[in-house]
Amino acid sequence: MKKELSNEELNDDIRLSIRTLENLFNQSYNYFAFKYTDIYTGFTISYNEKQEIFTASTIKAPMAIYLYEQAKKGLVNLDEKLTYTSAYYNTGTGVLKNREFNQDYTVRELISYAIIPSDNAAHNMLMDRYGRANMYNFWTEKGTTSIFRNYSNWGVVNANDATIYMKELYDYYNTDTELSNELMKNFTSVTFKPLSGKNNSKNTANKSGWSGTAFHDAAIVFDDNPYILVVLSNVGYSDYTYLFNLTSKVVSELHEKYWNLKYNKCQEIITG
């Protein structure tokens, strides 16, 4: 039954998990926002989901998704080559900063660099080639309100927007084409995974971001019934583990409780 349970149908155990999450994020103003969404039913729990914060490298995810969807339409050539010049040198994350200038890379390679090692130079090269405004128009049609709005290659994000683009990634992946599988492989190949699933499983597709105190992650968790989890924070790299580990644990438990209850409700309907 592809129908979420109503608030009245939730049991006390699930309500306790929800209160635990709310209490966790109320502990500090640096615990900025989160959103959990069960992909199959749309059941959602959130905190501060519409408030905006600096994107850091999370913005590379909707950029990559946009480019692959445009490639599917024949509007982007993933084999086109762009030249890495000194103008794009960036001391932040990535691999191009260790490469020679005036070398050519395909759009496909640059997208992979932007997602897996989170290459800032690759991101800026792609943004300059394809344009923030085009990405803004694409995503606002899908319901986002913050990403790509500012005249910057970075900008702001909120938890709801991050959920929208990760759900788009999941839906695109389910078209099961060569391109959609290639794109998803970039996200599953990311080695840095602040958010996790049941028993600390790292079976996720994610894109995190860190800049100064801003520290975020947006992940598809490949549970038996997959879900999306987004956490946005100002905790910084040195202090993220408590918030992200505990949120992952409580959400995975809540998700399991939710599906156990849903299964039991369905059985009651079937058996009368």
Model features per residue range: what roles?
Residues 33-36, 56, 113, 122, ...:
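Structural recognition of the beta-strand scaffold that forms the well-ordered cores
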Residues 1-28, 44, 52, 170-191, ...:
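Structured C-terminal helix/loop/strand segments within mature extracytoplasmic catalytic/sensor domains
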Residues 5-17, 99-182, 186:
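Active-site-adjacent helix/loop patches that line small-molecule binding or acyl-intermediate pockets
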Residues 37-39, 87, 115-118, 126-129, ...:
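Active-site-proximal beta-strand/loop segments in catalytic clefts of secreted hydrolases
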